[in-house]
Amino acid sequence: PITDLTIKDNSLIVATQGRSLWMIDDLTVLHQLPNSNKDPYLFKPKPTYRLRGNGGKNSLTMGTNKPNGVEVHFYIPSYEKGSDTVELSFHDEKGNEIKKFSTSDDDNKLEVKDGGNVFVWDYKYPGAEKFEGMVMWSASLNGAKAVPGTYQVKLSVNNFESQNSFEILKSPTSESSVDQMREQFNFVNQINKTISNAHQSIKKIRKIKLKLNEFLTNFSDNSDAENIIKKANFLVDSLSTVENALYQTKNESRQDPLNFPIKLTNKLGHIANLVTINDFPPTDQDKRLMMELSEKINKEIEVFNKLMTSDVSEFNLSFKKLQLDYLIN
């Protein structure tokens, strides 16, 4: 049975006979109820503490934790899947977009129903680029967590738009200062930018190698293409060298890194994984290792870019001069 009720920070707190305290709900939604329910409505999120861990439910005999993130309540009078587009975007204090979720986006999907809706933003900025079949060992490609401060949320329903500001607060249990959190934020963003550049290069490398291998299969017995076949083999080998330096291409399952050593982007992602265990800034050793790995990654990307501007371009010119049929019967 419920033995007591009180309000704390605009949340309803309930005490039960089992000596438990429960935070039932956010009462600010009731304080902001609109006069009409004909139009979409975006409620102003209440100030949210940036906490560690995540909300969840472990078993049927345990209570459900409050979601770890900014709870955004919004109202949609009616939603027709396929014809209506609903978007929820988060912005910094200057209005720069951080992340957008949409009913039409498969990656950042926004689930919507008629009536009241709630979405929880986990404070995170976009993470590093990924590619199909990628296997990493103890690495984080997650986005950096927003630093305590003022932010904006925007709701778009077809031609309707509304926005509100909200506050992310420093957790009273955190021993880090906001400046230290900001230093970690910038550090993780820098890591993710370097990893993204490398993984974008890997995607391009794999597309080029696919085309080159198709060429070698189709024209291996063409005596007129002997020189260009040598160029193709050289390109495949050179591109593979870059790819293998950036990423462990032998990995196919989650346990494969036990047998094959991790490569550059995995090592850099591992630093991000360690740094984000808490709210503290990176150590001097973290910074030095990050710079060392980033330099090695950038050198491999430079090699790839040179191959693109010289050898790949030369291959394309040679292919055109031979007037080879691209499509083989």
Language-model-detected regions and their locations in the chain:
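Extended low-complexity, serine/threonine- and proline-enriched intrinsically disordered segments
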Residues: 85-102, 155
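Short acidic/polar inter-strand loop motif in beta-rich domains
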Residues: 127-131, 156-164
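Beta-propeller blade termini and top-face loops
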Residues: 1-60, 67-69
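Mature extracytoplasmic or organellar-lumen-exposed domains after removal of signal/transit peptides
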Residues: 166, 199-329
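Low-complexity, Pro/Ser/Thr- and charge-rich linker/hinge segments at domain boundaries
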Residues: 29-53, 165-197
